[in-house]
Every structure is written in structure tokens, then in C-alpha cells.
Amino acid sequence: MIIKLKKGEVVFRNPELLAVDTKMVNLDRVLTNLFMQIYSVGAPVSLAVKTEHKIESLINYVKNLEDKGLVHGAKANQDAVEDWLRSNLLELVNRGNVVKEKVSSLKPMHLMSFRVQNRKYCRDYNTADQLYMMLKANPGVLGELKEYLRKGWDLSTNSMIGSEELDVDTTGILYLTKELKDKKGLNTDTKDAKPFLEKQTELFNDDIRRLLEYKDKLPRTVFIDYLKILCGFHLALYTMKLVYLLPKMVDAGSKDVVDDWSLVVDMTDNLDSKVAPYACQDAEHIANLYRSYVRSTFVINLCQNRLKASGANASVENALAYAKNELKKDDSYYEFALQAVRNGLEDDDARKEFDEILQYFDRNDYFDKYVHLLEKSNLGTTQYKYLGQFLDAVTMKNTTSMLFADSRSKRHPRRGAMGSKLLETLVQILLLQKDENGS
């Protein structure tokens, strides 16, 4: 039985734990939204162009550039322009489907590439929020990355810098976006939150700092590809570590628990290698923790809400301590919240299911009833599916950049596995050694 809660009645996502609203994401679109946040210093951005960008409209942009004398031969070679846009500059959804194909955005090759995007096809479900939050923890790394990404564009005058050399595709992106406008809004609460797993955030920023050592040595396409791989890799590590550690933190009533998380990775291409069973067991163990992670998140959310209602400090650390030491499960606050959910159900059948789900709990144990109800609701049950989809996406499963792999056969379930491009990226950054000054 699944209790159907109304949209917005209860929220699972907690930016103080993980900013991501875990769903299937595309890492290129995540980078597009991340670049927008880096450009706007975390503020929301309103784009001036409200109409949908299409292949035809972008070809017209190029024609207008020819009218201004900025490019030559576009009108006489429209097929070549379209091929260039499709293959080199654009992210497309349903690529190749004549009916369903739509423009998502420009490829994330430059800081300003976000200006051409159709937002409904460029959703990242707050994944860029998490990455920006982590980057913001090290202003030096964030500033250096921004400086690299904005190359060829003057942020103070909002114009191109002709003296800075760029590759053809990135230059094309700048010409397509140079006349477009945007408006920065105010910062949101999400951007003010700090990463929950500080040590994992430090590792992420250290890897980005190492990658930036190659900024003048690698072609821009290769650098951006490495950046995408590292972002996906660290999103996966951060999420899996949170899934593993959060239930332990709730049990301990503190954020200070032993971080003994690990992942066995099969480095072979053999599905039946000797290490494959151990890699499968580790991946299965992570999946088996989804339920306790979802429950722990609900526990923290409810305790934070209670602390806010009483005017107390509602940080995650205080919520953990409250759940362990001060929580009263018969608190009338949870009784009223539970009753409000019941009253909001659509019909008598739903209320009957509500009562059946909670019939074996102690009568006055309103807190555990509420948590269990949320687990059994549409909000809770979808989290298990979406969390797996999110991890499959950020680990780039079954690609050359993968951290996870599986096959269609039940004999070969999901396992940790390292793709050649991920290995290449990690080797490149690990070749660098710190000097005597620690830089």
C-alpha cells in the first residue's frame, strides 16, 4: 500500500545534506547549469530570450552574424552550418528523432554557453547546486576555474576579448551568445548552505585544483571532458558516502562518526573475474542502504522542523543530537502533523489504508508513525528508484567514463568498475605532486 501525499505537503530534499533532487541527470546539462551559477555567483539567472531555441533559429543567428560582417559564407553553406551546430555546438534531446528532437543548450565549452538553452530540456534537478556549494568551499579553486571558463569574454563589460585565442567551436559559442542578455536575481538559501561532508568536499576541490594545472596544456574539449568526469565521479562518491554514513550519524546522534566507507572496483573487462563478485557485493550493499538513508533523512527533516517551530537552532548537527537525546515520540507536534496528513487524504479508502499501515505502532508513538508513513508514501517509495537512477547517471554507467557497470543478465548485476577515460583522468591528476610549499 502506498499513501499518496499531495505535492509539496512534505519535502524529502534537504540542501543541508544533499542539494540534489535525485533523479536521472545528464552531466553535460549539469555543467551548463553549473557554469550559470559560477557566472552569477550562485544567484538565479533570468534569460532574456523566452521563445524556444530551435536549429532553424540558431542558423538564423549565424546568418545575422554574416550580415554584421563577423562570419562569411554562412548563407551559401546552410547545410554545413547546420552540421556544425548539430555535431560541435549543441546538446540535443532525442537526437536523431525527427519528431521529438529538441535543442537543450549549447555544449558546456564556455562560461557563457548557458545563454542558449531551453530550460525545460536542460533540467539538472539541483545537481549543479551541490557542485557549486562544494566549489564555493574553496574560493581559490572556484576563482581559478571561473577565470579559465570565461576566457575570451570580459565579464565587466559583457563583451568579447579578441586578443585571447580560443578554438573555433568555443569562439562560435561566444558569437552565438554575445548579443543575448540575462538578468541576475538574488541569492537563495540553497547557495548559502555549506557541504555536509567537508572532507569529501576537500578531495573534490583538490582534484579540480590539480586539473587546473593542465589548463594551458590541454585542448579545451579535453579539459572540459575531464572536468565533467571529475564532477560525476565526486558526485557519486559524495552521494554513496552520505548514504552509508547518515544512518550511522542518526544512531550516534552526532556527525562525528568513523568514515570507513569503501568501494571495491573491478579493473578488468572480464564480467567473471575473481574480483567481480566482491565488486557486486559492494554495489549491492550500497543499494541495500537506500531504505535506511531515506528514513534517516526523514528523521533529520522532522527534527529540524520541530526545532524551527520551537525557535531553536535547527542545524543538522542540532537535529542529530535532538533525535538522539531529546526527542519525545509522543510530542503533540507530530500528532497534529500526522492528523493533518490523514485529513488531507482524498477519500475513506485512503484513510483506511492510512490506519492499517500504522496499526501495529504504539498508540502515542506519533514520531515513528509519521516517519513510517513517509517511507510508505509516494514520496518515500520513489526515492529508492530515483536514487539508483541518479547514481547510474553520475557514475556514467557502462561508458568509457564509468564507475559502475552491469549487464542485462541477472548473472552480472551492477558492480564497481573503472572505465578507461575515468582511469586516464585520475592518472593525469595523480601524477602531480605537491611542492615544499604545499601548492
Predicted regions located by residue number:
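Long, mid-chain structured domain cores
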Residues: 87-256
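Alpha-helix boundary/N-cap detector
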Residues: 22-29, 46-56, 72, 76-80, ...
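C-terminal structured domain segments
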Residues: 425-439
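Charged, amphipathic alpha-helical stretches
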Residues: 1-123
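Long, low-complexity, charged/polar intrinsically disordered regions in eukaryotic proteins
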Residues: 342-427
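Charge-rich, solvent-exposed alpha-helical interaction surfaces
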Residues: 30-37, 54-65, 80-84, 88-92, ...
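Long, internal scaffold/assembly segments composed of regular secondary structure
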Residues: 224-359
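Surface-exposed polar/charged interaction patches
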Residues: 37, 41-44, 61-72, 87, ...
